[in-house]
Amino acid sequence: MPSIHASAVLVGARALLIRGPSGAGKSRLVLALLRQAERGFPAFVRLISDDRSLIEPHHGRLLVRPVPEIAGLIEVRGLGIRRLGYEPAAVIGCVVDLAAADGERLPAATRLRVEIEGISLPRLPVAADADALGLIWGSLATDGAG
């Protein structure tokens, strides 16, 4: 099972796989999603993995799991590594690419899909200066007009 540099969070019934370079805000975005859920957003949110994730194709879907050695751990800037409840596995429903060079106001439809391990998934390319949390909630709450 390949290990990739990414965090993952369960939102509702599907996982968001959050990719990006070091310092892009993967852990911060996971914590922001958890905080939104505490404020009553109508979706269950729970950590799956932080910083490293295991991915595995399974019956045409892509599963994500935490790396066992760091399961339930998350970096909180200014506090260090902290422990948090987590989900042991989930189906990836969307890939969020932070600090994406192709993050645009009106992206082409081809940029809104990505293939990982032979499986095509929805993708949110988030520019370095964009509101990642707003884009995620916008994608969850709306349908494409295409």
Residue ranges of predicted features:
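Conserved nucleotide-sensing/catalytic segment adjacent to the nucleotide-binding pocket
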Residues: 38-97
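Conserved NTP phosphate-binding and transfer environment spanning the P-loop NTPase/kinase superfamily
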Residues: 88-146
